[in-house]
């Protein structure tokens, strides 16, 4: 099962975005993206903004499931 950090990094790379580009689009610091991808930050406060910048569901990004689906 993938972690939040793995899903975020995989999605960012699929969109051919750098951490800096994602951070700018989401309105957060690049270091915040780096800490999430490193697995240091488990529950980012700007999860919704990051998910919108990645054009994905925030529930999927956090938990790896779609809304209403059990893991």
Swiss-Prot record:
Record's keyword annotation contains Transcription regulation: yes
Family matches, as SUPFAM superfamilies: lambda repressor-like DNA-binding domains
Keyword field: DNA-binding, Early protein, Repressor, Transcription, Transcription regulation
Molecular function via GO: DNA binding
Top-level taxonomic group: Viruses
PROSITE patterns: HTH_CROC1
Occurrences of domain HTH cro/C1-type (ranges): 8-61
DNA-binding region: 19-38
Gene3D superfamilies in the record: lambda repressor-like DNA-binding domains (1.10.260.40)
InterPro entries: Cro-like (IPR000655), Cro/C1-type_HTH (IPR001387), Lambda_DNA-bd_dom_sf (IPR010982)
GO biological process, one term: regulation of DNA-templated transcription
Role, per record: Cro represses genes normally expressed in early phage development and is necessary for the late stage of lytic growth. It does this by binding to the OL and OR operators regions normally used by the repressor protein for lysogenic maintenance.
Name of the protein in its database record: Regulatory protein cro
